[in-house]
């Protein structure tokens, strides 16, 4: 009994002092939290956030860690978490602002800044400290990096931790998840959505998915001006990004053929074109008319295969440099990066981990496969240099002070913002400088989950001491209502703007709204409503900017009003 008492209370004996005690407490908090996160009520789970609540319970009963160790593990966990997020979202961060992505990100910004305005209004009306209100804001929008950024900013400003930030987050978080899902469901009935029609339009890329996905379309050549022209001569005339994957000539042949830049078109030829939905209408009008063709049945010798880019020397090279068509007689028709299909244009730079779709004969595709790699074993080997180099650079960037007018203290990006920005930049521009930034999804997820688990456990342990007293005696239960207001009002406002001003497809809209609250349970709910990828594409398009703004605004609120 004495041994167990010493172990749990952390007395400096028997098990090597406080180390065994700290590891035990931290491990139990994380393990119990993850187990509780498996529980679903009405199909909704709080996931790893249960770690925070278990930590609060442990902290309430004084099962805690050394103060300095607690602070270190919390910050280190936060760094791992935000850095892994940056690696994931970085490749698509800047491209998300192009064309339709710009509109979706504008809508997400409305959600973010509406929440900030409501938070400020409640702060001035009720007199609740801004530290508490920022915690409520982060919980209401289920944004853990925002919580970390707020705590970091407050620590830089005052030199001490503010447990009320974590308390506000913990109180608002559960209904932040539920409130977001209920808002998405409410919009469905308010807009009287015809689900079949919306899903059909989403499948065609209508409703601001036109620039964010690619689709195949079969066309018959009817434009007399194209008769006898080569593909490479036609591309500048169309002024659209597209790939002609296959062709069947009107010369009695029943089989389809691959296309290269010197292939000539003739009236009546049937072609398979890969392009973004917004370009398909113009491309169709230019070539002729859409038709239905079963391409797989026309030539059994042609196969289509997805191949992974796993050779480091290909990192940053363009498709034109690889000369797949000239060397092997196969065609690259599309490139999948981070779950999004891209048009395989000659200028597209490849990255480690890209999945390219190649069409050709079995022999040609096999030769191309050897050149590209397609070795999961090679991808599974972690590239640790960019991770730790990026974390080091992120810590340096996060420590640089920036002066803003009206803010008495210099603003620092901190240990949340610095590593996030560096990881986005490295993952986006690293391949151009031959820096391998790819990590497998499982490895990235492992880093992220370890980071968020450490962070939430430490936040809960630190906030547990005064949690019950705050809720019962200091009016903490009212924070729940404030959190619901911050959750629901911006979503409904943005929902109406997105539907009636931006004419968004419903499934795209709910994906954007889920992404603007960085809410994975809401995305899971949205995906369950439809078989199309519109919610996931909408979520992924706005997630990077939203995450960045949540971190930045949380810091600015603390530094300007703290």
Swiss-Prot record:
Q: Does the keyword Transmembrane apply?
A: yes
Q: Which Gene3D superfamilies match?
A: Regulator of K+ conductance, C-terminal domain
Q: Which GO terms describe its molecular function?
A: monoatomic cation transmembrane transporter activity
All copies of domain RCK C-terminal, residue ranges: 204-286, 289-374
Compartment annotation: Cell membrane
Question: Some GO term, biological process aspect, for this entry: which one?
Answer: potassium ion transport
A GO-annotated cellular component: plasma membrane
Q: What keywords sit in the KW lines?
A: Cell membrane, Membrane, Repeat, Transmembrane, Transmembrane helix, Transport
PROSITE patterns membership: RCK_C
Q: InterPro entries given for it?
A: AAE_transporter, RCK_C, RCK_C_sf, YidE_YbjL
Query: Key word Hydrolase present in the record?
Result: no
Topology class, membrane: Multi-pass membrane protein
* UniProt xrefs under PANTHER family: K(+)_H(+) ANTIPORTER SUBUNIT KHTT, TRANSPORT PROTEIN YIDE-RELATED
Q: Which family does it belong to?
A: Belongs to the AAE transporter (TC 2.A.81) family.
- The entry's protein name is Uncharacterized transporter BF2507
Q: What organism does the record attribute this protein to?
A: Bacteroides fragilis (strain YCH46)
């Amino acid at each position: 009994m004495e041994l167990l008492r010493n172990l749990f209370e952390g007395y400096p004996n028997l098990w090597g002092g406080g180390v065994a005690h700290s590891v035990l407490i931290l491990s139990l908090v994380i393990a119990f939290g993850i187990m509780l996160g498996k529980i679903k009520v009405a199909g909704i789970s709080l996931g790893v956030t249960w770690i925070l609540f278990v930590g609060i319970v442990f902290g309430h009963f004084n099962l805690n860690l050394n103060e300095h160790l607690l602070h270190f593990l919390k910050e280190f966990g936060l760094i791992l978490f935000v850095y892994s997020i940056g690696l994931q979202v970085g490749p698509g961060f800047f491209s998300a602002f192009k064309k339709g992505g710009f509109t979706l990100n504008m809508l997400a910004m409305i959600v973010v800044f509406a929440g900030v305005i409501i938070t400020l209004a409640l702060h001035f009306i009720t007199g609740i400290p801004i530290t508490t209100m920022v915690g409520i804001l982060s919980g209401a929008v289920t944004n853990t990096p925002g919580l970390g950024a707020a705590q970091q900013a407050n620590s830089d400003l005052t030199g001490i931790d503010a447990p009320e930030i974590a308390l506000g987050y913990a109180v608002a978080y559960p209904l932040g998840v539920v409130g977001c899902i209920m808002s998405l469901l409410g919009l469905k009935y308010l807009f009287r959505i015809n689900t079949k029609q919306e899903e059909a339009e989403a499948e065609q890329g209508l409703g601001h998915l036109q620039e964010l996905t690619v689709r195949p379309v079969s066309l018959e050549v009817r434009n007399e001006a194209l008769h006898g022209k080569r593909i490479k001569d036609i591309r500048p005339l169309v002024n659209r990004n597209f790939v002609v994957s296959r062709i069947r000539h009107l010369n009695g042949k029943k089989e389809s053929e691959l296309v290269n830049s010197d292939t000539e078109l003739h009236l009546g030829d049937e072609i398979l074109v890969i392009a973004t939905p917004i370009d398909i209408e113009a491309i169709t009008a230019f070539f002729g008319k859409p038709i239905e063709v079963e391409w797989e049945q026309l030539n059994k010798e042609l196969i289509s295969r997805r191949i992974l880019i796993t050779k480091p020397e290909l990192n940053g090279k363009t498709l034109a440099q690889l000369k797949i068509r000239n060397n092997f007689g196969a065609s690259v028709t599309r490139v999948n990066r981070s779950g999004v299909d891209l048009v395989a244009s000659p200028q597209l730079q490849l990255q480690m981990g890209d999945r390219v779709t190649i069409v050709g004969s079995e022999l040609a595709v096999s030769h191309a496969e050897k050149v590209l790699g397609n070795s999961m074993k090679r991808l599974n080997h972690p590239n640790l240099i960019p991770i730790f180099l990026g974390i080091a650079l992120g810590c340096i960037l996060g420590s640089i002070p920036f002066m803003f007018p009206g803010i008495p203290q210099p603003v620092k990006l901190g240990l949340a913002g610095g590593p996030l920005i560096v990881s986005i930049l490295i993952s986006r521009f690293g391949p151009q400088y031959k820096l391998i930034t790819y990590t497998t999804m499982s490895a990235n997820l492992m880093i992220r989950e370890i980071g968020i688990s450490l962070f939430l456990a430490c936040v809960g342990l630190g906030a547990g001491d005064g949690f019950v007293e705050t809720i019962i005696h200091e009016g903490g239960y009212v924070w729940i209502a404030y959190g619901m207001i911050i959750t629901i009002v911006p979503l409904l406002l943005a929902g109406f703007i997105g539907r009636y001003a931006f004419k968004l497809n419903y499934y795209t809209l709910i994906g954007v709204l889920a992404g603007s609250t960085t809410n994975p349970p809401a995305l899971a709910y949205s995906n369950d409503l439809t078989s199309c990828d519109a919610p996931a594409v909408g979520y992924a398009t706005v997630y990077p900017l939203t995450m960045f703004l949540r971190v930045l605004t949380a810091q600015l609120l603390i530094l300007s009003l703290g």
